[in-house]
């Protein structure tokens, strides 16, 4: 066995010790470097994550806010940008500075069409992007069965809470959504009659009545929230005359405007979509029940304090400005009141610094001259679309646009293209941007017992009643008329006709027609014709029915086939 000398052993241990120190030093050095590199990598990752999060927030912030403002029963002369809105000297007929701003800076939809020109189905078109024949509430589908399977579109095309609406589509995009003002579209207690109707002469200060009104209001709020709206307030379940209590049958645009402003205040830091609907200039329009009314009277009951959103003092301010403009009467005070409400939204958007990223739509729910029918005076309406800096198309869009097109267009403008094929409506975003736009080759309309299609300047118009109604005896027609008259009298309105032999209406199957269509019944020369054909270019007032003119036989055939195509894609029957 070989022995190691102590001196060599000491040297070896010393060598190992020195090398261990070097190794440890290197290890610590590289470990430190590794920690530094790891920290730097983590820091970079955090920076990248933070950058990504900031980019996501920036992208979120770039989503345009949407304000969809829908007015009620406006006439063409109420828009100063039109020839009908000016007097013979070219001066504006109305004091509407905010609407004038929309005309100057936004896009006027020159050929704005409404599918179903009365309140409820028009709102259905806007909020769903679909034709009202697709309504699925129980009263609508039951009524279809009683009419031999033919859908009859009236004030019955309610949206059932839970169905997809403008609200739900925008919620899916990360928007906060609001619903303010007139409802008349989301089904709730007030529509289906599950709660006892307060007496017409009930006292809104009576504790029992207050309790009932509050119950109805909160149930309506819940149903609207179920329909895709985070915020639902300052609501009218219907027009003031239909609230069930005479003492509440007053307009209150201040209250509605307050709801819009409160919504913007609450959700100004989020992308938001606000649907706001006024009850004017629909009746009641007499000063005492409209612009001169007590601002504490609302659909919810009597407020303790009046809203303080619009120019103050409200009545005096409107009166003074209208008198200074020399425009008293003819409901122009109500138009200024309406304009003030739109102006209040603009001011709030500007104050909160979100106006530059907001798209505003102003839409009149339907034509008023022949409301309740598919004549041009009913289906022609008015609308603006506004955004800061305008759209490339300029101030006027000539392309025909339907109110079912609003929802897909707004979704398209908000960056959602995946849902665009789910609607009867079509996006016209490309037209607004001045790009190539195929547009529509025809326009479809439906209301009551009538259907119509417009193509290449011609309109085919058909009216059909169930066979059992056409076989009615005189006594049955008389009974129908009496029931309808009692119904109108139940909410303070008068009977329309007293003649059981009068032709049925197109909207309501009663002799002499219903209230909404009565103007057309009295004044349209071909109202009672079951088949009508018009050359809209040469006969825009639809006075000459060409249905039996052999010269237009081929045109009629083409239009009938076009109408059949629409009807075959929708629920219900309609015989052409």
Where are these regions (language model features)?
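Bacterial N-terminal signal peptides that target proteins for export
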Residues: 20-32
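Bacterial N-terminal signal peptides
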Residues: 31-39
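C-terminal motif of bacterial Sec signal peptides marking the signal peptidase cleavage site
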Residues: 42-43
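Active-site-proximal cap/lid insertion segments
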Residues: 60-64, 71-94, 101, 214, ...
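Active-site segment of extracytoplasmic enzymes that catalyze sulfate/phosphate-ester chemistry
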Residues: 68-69, 75-165, 169-179, 188-189, ...
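Short, solvent-exposed turn/loop segments enriched in Gly/Ser/Thr/Pro and often Arg
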Residues: 82-83, 106-131, 138-144, 179-191, ...
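Polar, surface-exposed loop/tail segments
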Residues: 97, 126, 182, 186-191, ...
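Acidic, His- and aromatic-enriched active-site or binding-groove loops in soluble protein domains
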Residues: 133-138, 195-236
């Amino acid at each position: 066995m070989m022995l190691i000398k102590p001196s060599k052993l000491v040297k070896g241990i010393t060598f190992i010790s020195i090398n261990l120190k070097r190794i440890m030093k290197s290890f610590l050095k590289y470990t430190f470097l590794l920690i530094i590199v790891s920290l730097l990598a983590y820091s970079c990752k955090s920076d990248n994550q933070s950058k990504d999060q900031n980019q996501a927030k920036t992208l979120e912030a770039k989503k345009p806010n949407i304000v969809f403002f829908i007015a009620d029963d406006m006439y063409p002369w109420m828009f100063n940008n039109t020839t009908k809105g000016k007097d013979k000297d070219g001066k504006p007929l109305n004091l509407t500075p905010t609407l004038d701003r929309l005309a100057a800076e936004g896009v006027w939809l020159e050929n704005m069409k409404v599918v179903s020109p009365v309140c409820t189905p028009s709102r259905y078109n806007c909020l769903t992007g679909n034709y009202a024949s697709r309504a699925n509430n129980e009263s609508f589908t039951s009524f279809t069965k009683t009419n031999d399977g033919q859908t009859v579109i009236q004030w019955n095309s309610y949206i059932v809470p839970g169905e997809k609406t403008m609200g739900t589509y925008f919620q899916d995009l990360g928007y906060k959504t609001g619903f303010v003002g007139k409802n008349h579209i989301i089904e709730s207690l007030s529509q289906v009659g599950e709660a006892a109707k307060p007496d017409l002469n009930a006292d809104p200060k009576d504790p029992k009545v207050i309790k009932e009104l509050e119950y109805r209001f909160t149930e309506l709020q819940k149903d609207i929230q179920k329909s895709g709206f985070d915020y639902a307030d300052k609501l009218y379940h219907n027009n003031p005359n239909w609230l069930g209590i005479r003492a509440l049958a007053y307009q209150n645009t201040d209250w509605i405007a307050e709801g819009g402003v409160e919504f913007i205040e609450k959700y100004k830091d989020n992308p938001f979509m606000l649907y706001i609907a006024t009850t004017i200039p629909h009746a009641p329009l007499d000063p005492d029940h409209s612009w001169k009314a007590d601002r504490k009277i609302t659909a919810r009951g009597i407020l303790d304090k009046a809203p303080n959103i619009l120019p103050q003092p409200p009545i005096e301010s409107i009166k003074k400005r209208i008198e200074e403009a020399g425009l008293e009467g003819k409901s122009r005070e109500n138009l200024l009141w309406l304009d003030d409400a739109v102006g209040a939204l603009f001011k709030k958007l500007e104050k909160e610094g979100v106006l530059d990223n907001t798209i505003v739509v102003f839409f009149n729910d339907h034509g008023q001259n022949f409301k309740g029918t598919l004549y041009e005076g009913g289906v022609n309406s008015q609308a603006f679309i506004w955004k800061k800096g305008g759209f490339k198309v300029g101030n006027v869009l000539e392309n025909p646009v339907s109110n079912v097109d609003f929802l897909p267009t707004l979704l398209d403008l908000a960056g959602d293209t995946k849902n665009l094929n789910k609607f009867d409506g079509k996006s016209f975003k490309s037209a607004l941007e001045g790009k190539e736009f195929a547009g529509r080759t025809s326009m479809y309309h439906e209301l009551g017992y009538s259907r119509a299609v417009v193509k290449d300047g011609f309109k085919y118009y058909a009216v059909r009643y169930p066979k059992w109604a056409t076989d009615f005896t005189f006594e049955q027609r008389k009974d129908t008329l009496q029931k309808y008259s009692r119904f109108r009298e139940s909410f303070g309105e008068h009977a329309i006709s007293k003649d059981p032999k009068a032709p049925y209406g197109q909207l309501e199957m009663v002799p002499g027609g219903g209230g909404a269509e009565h103007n057309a019944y009295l004044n349209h020369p071909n109202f009672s014709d079951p088949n009508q054909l018009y050359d809209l270019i040469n006969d825009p007032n639809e006075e000459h029915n060409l249905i039996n003119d052999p010269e237009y036989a081929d045109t009629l055939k083409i239009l009938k086939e076009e109408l059949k195509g629409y009807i075959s894609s929708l629920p219900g029957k309609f015989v052409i």
